[in-house]
């Protein structure tokens, strides 16, 4: 029979390599955690502002929330969003300003989008980037107000509305041909960045997501902030009611896909409070007021 001393010695011999492996594993794990933490901290954090530049009074809620009472009306907010940080001033959507929209729509409380930035001390030429969530007139018409900005749009959105959409009268509702021509011209000038699909970080700390299906390839935006990720849903979620009642927007090409996008927004955002709908006037009361018509998303 082996002596206890010999057994202990053998156990020690076998244990040493195991302990060495364990220590190596712990070192690698700790390093990975530190790298991940450093990466998260190195992403720039932006200030995010919602800017109300106009109102559409008495808008039918049934055109915003699927299945809503047709008699319900709401004075909806027309908004753009400013992301400020990392040496950039980034707009999400550009609003509208051309005269013919005022005869086609009942617009009140209008401020030209380029002027609506003034309370934040931002001039039109200070805008470095404009992210167009989709090509509808009230989101894309003002892109040429910002002469030094790079315009970002989903590649499929540009290709569809510059081509196939016009082969039928039923596939370009809400799209103004002049806005399409402006976008094509800006592309020929080298000022358009094409976002190729879902989950694309186009600028450090700013990521575009697809799936809302408000238009052919509409996108929404996730923004890194000090409070965590803010989601700017734009028209992929018109009102808080869409999210709270888990109801798709009324104007979508795919209701199931729109609901999946809303569910995903909850996963992306640091908390549901930081999911910002596209036209809900309640945005202006849920967040701290910075100036008339301007709130800080936090």
Where are these regions (language model features)?
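Metallo-beta-lactamase
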Residues: 43, 111-122, 126-138, 156-210, ...
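Cap/insert and terminal regions of metallo-dependent hydrolase folds
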Residues: 107-111, 216-298
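Active-site metal-binding loops of divalent metal-dependent hydrolases
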Residues: 53-54, 94-96, 135, 156-157, ...
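Bacterial N-terminal signal peptides
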Residues: 27-37
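Core dinuclear metal-dependent hydrolase active-site scaffold
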Residues: 47-52, 68, 73-75, 80-84, ...
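Pre-active-site segment of Zn-dependent metallo-hydrolases
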Residues: 58-80, 84-129
């Amino acid at each position: 029979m082996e002596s206890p001393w010999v057994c202990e010695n053998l156990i020690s011999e076998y244990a040493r390599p195991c302990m060495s492996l364990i220590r190596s594993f712990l070192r690698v794990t700790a390093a990975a955690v530190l790298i991940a933490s450093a990466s998260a901290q190195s992403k720039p954090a932006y200030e995010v502002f919602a800017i109300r530049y106009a109102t559409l009074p008495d808008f039918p809620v049934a055109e915003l929330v699927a299945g809503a009472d047709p008699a319900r009306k709401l004075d909806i907010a027309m908004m753009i969003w400013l992301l400020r940080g990392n040496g950039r001033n980034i707009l999400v959507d550009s609003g509208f300003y051309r005269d013919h929209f005022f005869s086609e729509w009942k617009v009140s409380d209008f401020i030209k989008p380029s002027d609506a930035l003034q309370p934040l001390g931002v001039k039109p030429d200070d805008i470095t980037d404009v992210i167009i969530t989709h090509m509808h007139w009230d989101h894309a018409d003002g892109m040429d107000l910002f002469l030094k900005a790079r315009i970002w749009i989903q590649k499929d959105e540009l290709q569809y509305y510059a081509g196939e959409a016009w082969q039928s009268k039923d596939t370009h509702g809400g799209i103004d041909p002049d806005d399409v021509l402006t976008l094509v011209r800006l592309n020929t000038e080298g000022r358009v960045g094409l976002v190729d699909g879902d989950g694309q970080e186009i600028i450090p700390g700013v990521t575009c997501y697809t799936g809302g299906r408000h238009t052919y390839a509409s996108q929404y935006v996730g923004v890194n902030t000090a409070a965590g990720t803010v989601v700017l849903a734009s028209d992929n979620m018109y009102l808080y009611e869409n999210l709270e009642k888990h109801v798709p927007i009324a104007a979508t090409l795919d209701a199931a896909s729109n609901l999946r996008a809303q569910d995903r927004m909850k996963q992306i955002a640091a908390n549901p409070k930081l999911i910002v709908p596209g036209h809900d006037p309640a945005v202006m009361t849920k967040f701290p007021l910075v100036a008339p018509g301007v709130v800080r998303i936090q």
